[in-house]
A protein has these predicted regions:
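Flexible beta->alpha loop and helix N-cap segments adjacent to enzyme active/binding sites
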Residues: 1-229
Length: 229
């Protein structure tokens, strides 16, 4: 479809939230109002975004991921849409053959067959997946070029749902860069910061509840790293 319709756009939030934002944007253009700023939470929340992580925190987190830790990553404002894109994510290295089963059983508490997505540096995506160009919203399924190398992110049919990360996503981009320095691979397993049947963590309190009630090894909220061991 993309070959025959090169300018095809699939909205990343085809739900009530997206309809509301679309209605606002339509009226904005109709009345020549200023563009909406990208910064900020898309709806009201009762706590502030945490401070940004320091370079040291990002490097320390990359080291934990390289060691095989399961990390909750809570940064900035929240995201809307069906996927976690680096602000409300559970992250893990993409190599561990038991990684998918472990997260499904111990953290997500959901069916064992359900696959996980991945994040990759935008400029490196074609080195690991059959894909060229951006895919920032994790809406496309891509063939994994070396499925045996990345078992926890590779579905039974050899594909993975991927979100590409650009320099605009400063902190998450830096995390992938630091992880690449340690492992040689700018790819992380990325799933939403929640467990089965629960919405993605919208507040710091939600992230802390998930951390203490599951087997997450580490939770990074802003510039603070919480470790259980």
């Amino acid at each position: 479809m993309r070959d025959s319709i090169p300018n095809l756009v699939i909205p990343p939030h085809a739900n009530d939230q997206g309809l509301s934002i679309g209605a606002i944007e339509y009226l904005r253009k109709e009345y020549n109002l200023m563009a909406l700023p990208k910064e900020g939470f898309p709806f009201m929340q009762d706590d502030e975004a945490p401070p940004r992580p320091s370079t040291k925190t990002i490097k320390d987190t990359a080291e934990l991921l390289a060691q095989g830790k399961i990390v909750g990553w809570y940064q900035g404002h929240g995201e809307i849409g069906p996927r976690a894109l680096g602000n409300r994510s559970i992250l893990m290295n993409p190599f561990d053959p038991q990684g998918k089963d472990w997260i499904n059983a111990k953290v997500k508490h959901r069916e064992p067959f359900r696959p996980f997505g991945a994040s990759v540096l935008e400029e490196k995506v074609s080195q690991y997946f059959y894909w060229n160009g951006p895919s920032p919203y994790m809406l496309y399924v891509m063939d994994v070029l070396e499925p045996d190398r990345f078992p926890p992110i590779t579905h039974a049919d050899g594909t993975c749902r991927v979100n590409t990360v650009s320099p605009e996503q400063e902190d998450y981009y830096m995390l992938l860069k630091e992880y690449e320095k340690l492992t040689g691979v700018p790819v992380l397993l990325n799933t939403s910061l929640n467990n089965g049947g629960r919405p993605i963590a919208g507040r710091i309190a939600d992230a802390l509840e998930l951390y203490y009630k599951t087997d997450l090894d580490t939770l990074v909220v802003g510039d603070e790293i919480k470790n259980k061991s």
